[in-house]
């Protein structure tokens, strides 16, 4: 990962840089100046993951979170896991992530809210655990959501988890 600049690119992403941002080459210096602690540890994540996969852990004072993503070639990547929740999205579009107990009408309800607020859905993906009947729903959008709509969609008590990833 060092010879290809992957470490710099990953740190640049954590700093919020776009892939074309010239500051990526100085990501280590910038992270150090912002007092961001980082460490790269080569680890085998197992055969369930693509060989070019990375787990990024975010350690806070009171909790830890992580994201697992894979480089799939051509400068493209896919996020496959967030805090143990199986997902699938590429990070190029604003994304809604939901986890809920299987029930009819959830996708329709969310789609209707988005339609009524003039948002277009780029893609929808569901991953259902047949044993627990828990669904992980990913909705990629064509534009960022308003703060009010994010709040409306992510505070619904029907969801075990609801998050919004802005691009």
Predicted features and spans:
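Glycine-rich loop at the start of a catalytic domain that most often binds anionic cofactors/ligands
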Residues: 1-9
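A conserved regulatory-domain signal marking ACT and ACT-like small-molecule sensing domains
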Residues: 9, 14, 22-26, 40-43, ...
